[in-house]
Amino acid sequence: MATVNVRDTLVNLTSRLIQINTVNPPGLTSEASSFIKDWLGSLGYSCEIREYVKGKPNVVARVGKGSPTLILNGHMDVVPPGDESRWSYPPFSGKVIGDRIYGRGATDMKGGLAVVMLVFAELAPLVEGAGSGTLVFSATADEEVGGHAGVEALVKDGVLVGDAAIVAEPTGFNRYCIGEKGLCQLRLIARGRPAHGSLPILGENAILKLVKAIEGAQRIVEEFNRNIKLPPDVEEAALNAASIYGQEASRRGLGLSLEDFRRVIGSVSFNPGVIRGGSKVNMVPDHAELELDMRVPPGVDPAGLIEAVKSGLRGLAEVEPIDVSSPNYTPRDSPIVRLIEDGIRRLGAEPKPIIMTGATDGRYLRARGIPTVIYGPGELTLAHAYDEYVTVNDLVNTYNVMLYASSRFFNIPSPG
C-alpha cells in the first residue's frame, strides 16, 4: 500500500462508516459491505461476500498462504440511536469535532472496523512478500443480535479458521479483553388455576407463584455465587473492568463502589428482564412467566447454574433455557495476548487485561480453539450511549498497537 496519512485515513474511514446506517434490527449491511469491498478493491485486494441471511452480507479478504493464520475482525451493525433529539449531532453524521468523531457506532464499533481495515491494508503486502502465513480480514453482520448470521455462520462454514484472532471491540488503547461472561437466559413459567377475581380463594394465582419463584431464584443465585472461584488472571481482569465502571459511576454520582462492580462482574448477575401474566384484571391468572437474564463469569459452568435453579424451583415454576453460551477466555500467556501487551508498552502505557460483561463475536472464535484477544478503540462506557464518540487519538494508538502485534505475529518488522 502506498504511504498514507494514518490519522486522516482513520478519521475519514470512521466518519464514512458511521454515515452508513446499519442499525440492528434490521441490521442490513449491504451498503457497508459494498463500501468496504470497494475500498479494499481500490488497493488491489479482492473480497469474498458471504450472505447467510438476506440483507446481511459479510466481507472476507485474505492474503498469503499457509500457517500461521491471523484473523482481524470487526462488525458492521450498530444498535438503534434512541431518541435522536437527545444527540448533540445527528447520530449518523460522523461529525468530527476536535479530537472526537461522533455518531452511533463510533465506539461500537465503526472506529474499530476502520482500524482493522487499515491494519489489513498496510500489512497485507508484507505478509504476501514473506511467502508464508495468512492474514484474514472479516467485516461481519449481526453481532448486536447474537452474531448468528455473521461470525457464528462464518466459523461453522469453515471460512474463519486460524491460529489467533483480534476482534476490535472497544477497550481503550491501554486495555485489552481476555474473556467474557457467558449468557444464561431462562424462562420461568408459573401455572395456576383461574377463578373470578372477587373470590381468589377458589383459584391459584400464577403471578403470586411467579413472584415466589423469582425470589427463590435470586436466593439460589446468591448461594451459587458464594462458591465461585475465578482463575487468577480472570480475577485480575475483573478488577480492572470494575475500575472502569467504578470511575464512570463516580463521575455520575451513582454512589456505587469499586467493590460493588467487582462483585457483580466476578459473579453470576441476576436481572429479571421481561414479565408477562394474566389476561384480565378481574380474573385469577392461571399463567405467568419471566424472562431472566444472567451472565456467568469465566470458570463457571452455566449447566450447573441451570440445574441449581431447576432443582430449587421444582413444584413452583418450570424452567426453560432461552439462550445459553459458555463463558470464555484466552490465557494471558497466549502469544497474541503477549504481542498486544508489548505493543501497548511500546507506546509508554502499562497494559491492563479486562473481561467483558456482555458477549462479543470472540466467543465463536474461542469455541473453535482460536486464541482471541478483544482490542480496539473507544470506551466501554460510551457504547450504546447518546452522543457516542471515539477519539482520533485512540484510533491512532490502537492502530499502532494492532499493526505492531500483527506484524510480529508473522515475524515481520512492524511497518509502523
Walk through the language-model features, giving the residues of each.
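Buried hydrophobic positions in well-ordered alpha/beta secondary-structure cores of metabolic enzymes
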Residues: 21, 61, 72-75, 116, ...
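N-terminal helical capping/dimerization or prosegment-like subdomains
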Residues: 2-84, 287-291, 302-308, 394
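Midchain, well-structured core segments that form catalytic/ion-binding scaffolds
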Residues: 156-310
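An extended, acidic, His-containing surface patch that forms the Zn2+-binding/catalytic region
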Residues: 42, 48, 81, 223-274, ...
